[in-house]
Amino acid sequence: LASDLNGGANGEDIEALLATNGLSDLLVEKTATIGEKLSVRRFAKVTGDAVASYIHGGGRIGVLVAADGASNDAIKEALTNVAMQIAAMSPEYLSKDCISDDELAKMKSITIDSSLNKPESLPKPILKNLFDKAVNDKLFSDEDLAAYEEQKNNKFLFNFLSDKAVETLVELAMASKADIVANKIFAGAVDGRMKKQLKEVCLLEQAFVRSDLYDGDVAGYIADVAKKLGASIKATGFIRYAKGEGIEKKEENYAEEIAKMTGNK
């Protein structure tokens, strides 16, 4: 990772990158040193008034993080702490504002379907309606019906139901999807799960891992540093690369390979 290379445009032109600052010669030199061919597979750039880098695990993970505002050693140290956060917590976005409406809609759709496929997690009034329909329409086996009647007040009820009974509840939930989604209790539960997911995937919303330095989220840590330094600091972007990321590994089926070699099928 390097923050002062000018070649290429947002990772699109590797040839232009290699022609910058003697990088091509450096690759040749390093190849001769270690005896293995080195090549640039991908790259990305971040820009800002201050840029900090962090390499973890001897090169297993590399991070660049940029911010606009002031630039000094204290700010770069703070950004290095943020880079360590990125290495450890693997955020996908800088903030919620960086997620498109289509992506948010997809996340919500997945969250809804995930909830419907786990009936035990549904709000009690909705789950009761599903059980009532399954019982009234005689959709349960005699064994599951008996288990339900005996254990319906047990919080571990689902431990006594068969997989088939759970599948039946899932089918009923999916069939009533529109009504369930319109339910205020369910909608509130979905919103809560969405907020939790966004805190996991958005850097600025994540809980700051260096709680010894600041107890709060990453955005709060940056604001706290800016206040103490009397400076303006606004995170503008980051890059996180992991070793082997994006490389597809060929899966070998040795049983099939041996069968081919011996003429067996």
Name each region found by the language model:
Residues 1-265:
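N-terminal assembly/interaction segments in proteins that build large macromolecular machines
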